[in-house]
Amino acid sequence: MSESSVNADTPKNTNDVLNGAYQSATTEPEGQYRSATDNPSLYQVPTHGSLYRNLSNSASAYYPANGNMNSREPANELSDISSLAEKGELEPPMAKLLSDPDFQGKQFPTVEAPELFIFELAPDSPSIALNWTFWRKMKTTSIYAYASLTIAWGSSVLSPASATLAKKYHIGMTTSLLNVSLFMLGYCLGPICWAPMSEITGRKTPLYIGLFLFSVFQIAVATAQDIQTIMICRFFGGYGACVPLCVVAAAFADMYPNRYRGTAITIFAAVIFVGPLVAPIVGGFLTKSYLGWRWTEYITSFMGFLSIILIYLFCEETYLKTITENKVQEYREITGNQLVHARSEEESLSARDIIMNYLLIPLKMLATEPIVFLVSLYCSFVYAIIYLLLEAYPVIFQEGRHFPLGVSALPYIGILVGVFIGCGINCLFEPWYFRQVIKAGNKPAPEARLPPMMIGSFLFPAGIFWLAWSGYYTYVHWIVPTLSGLLTGAGILLIFLQCLNYLLDAYLFRAASVFAANVIMRSAVAGGFPLFAVQMFHNMGVGWAGSLLGFIATALIPMPFAFFFFGKKIRAKSKMTAQF
């Protein structure tokens, strides 16, 4: 039989094959085979790859593995092609492809229908992260939350050793505090690279690279013999550590619909604050013990490497574009058909495109989007207060009340409890938010995220004023300033969390970039606060230094109310929200 006759009679699609609907074939003389649409038969060819390359037919060669590969005789009679896969009579890769629900019932391309060469996942595909089962999502959510906790822990675990470092290397206390500030500076610069990478390669690749850098440089800090090495390695550790800050929240947006996304981001926000608050407690006791400050970094490194292992073993890609491209690549490897492709693969990215459309997007958002700038500014202030309090609490409790190292960090527990109270308050608002989403036609309702932030805007300055004046009078029992953390922690969590949720709902299709913009600003602010915290509390006194922060927090109270009433109008004028 000539090649042209084969080309004319070869099946045009595999809908019936993939649905297991092929019936028994009737043997016909050579040259008189009917097409699959008339008589659904399977034909053996030397290789399925050659069939696809020569005839441009996709996934039609679901043929038995046994038989004469040099003849074009009809395959064994098939009543149910899936039974062949069970019997092992199909080549394993083809059997795997046949069992994949993403390829079942799909019409594949022919030269007459070239538009079908573009592969897209169905909206209800189980491969899409949004359609995963609850436990499948929880597995990835838990591991990503642990990775976020690890890098947040690493940002402050060395803070209690600042005095030890100053004494050991004969430097001033302000210079020693650079171990926190330089880590935060790495946080600030990293998102310019990592967030765009996650929108090109997927979420997992930058996580691997970033967490590896973070973990390696923690070991470098632990083994450093001079202060210069410590500071440089802290910076590069922060540069790698910022990946979960940009990518994890975006991955949660990939997995969770509007109704549950707020709860997922609550988990993320909680671990971002739990890490910096718990780490100084552990770090203080380690520094004071026979293990010494170096083990704060060794332990952090072990935690980072464990994150990488867990992500590699148990986490799946969540970014839809990357999932689709991986599916297409798997299909091409099995079938040999190089013509099928994902729509995203039609994009041709030049160096200029990558710079303008990816690398500079976070900076462009900060410069041109009032919502991104103002919300990130408020978020930055409350986030930076956490790192300022890491230096202010030792002044209040270690210097003022003579608490020993380690014990002086225990009052952070008050803020920690406040953070969990804030999580509870936020969860109470989730049903109300979901009703607003339904009213909006099952679309994100950014302004409906703001009522918890309104509550937090009052709790936050109240807690700061409470700490300032109860901490100023040293004869006041230590539990009183400690309890101020309940209001401070709850306020910080409610403001920070709803800032993230508001930005996510408003810029959902650029989630990684908008979070990168937020991380850049808040890390820059948080990196500077520890440098002047001690001097401010020494020179102004605990009462007035705390009051200054309280006055700034009070001045920011109107911000969530302004966005609640006018945010929709502001977003309507935004070119970027319309573009995305």
From Swiss-Prot:
In the UniProt record, the signal sequence range is: none
The membrane topology term of the UniProt record is: Multi-pass membrane protein
Subcellular localization is given as: Membrane
Q: Which residues cross the membrane?
A: 143-163, 177-197, 207-227, 235-255, 265-285, 295-315, 370-390, 405-425, 450-470, 476-496, 511-533, 546-566
GO biological process terms, alphabetically, are: spermidine transmembrane transport; spermine transmembrane transport; transmembrane transport
Provide a GO CC annotation, any one: plasma membrane
Name the keywords, alphabetized.
Membrane, Phosphoprotein, Transmembrane, Transmembrane helix, Transport
Polar residues: compositionally biased ranges:
1-44
Could you tell me which residues belong to the region Disordered?
A: 1-45
**The keyword Plastid appears for this protein:** no
Task: Give the sites modified to Phosphoserine.
Answer: 99
Q: Which family does it belong to?
A: Belongs to the major facilitator superfamily. CAR1 family.
Q: What is this protein called?
A: Uncharacterized transporter C36.01c
Origin organism of this chain?
Schizosaccharomyces pombe (strain 972 / ATCC 24843)
High-level lineage: Eukaryota, Fungi, Dikarya, Ascomycota, Taphrinomycotina
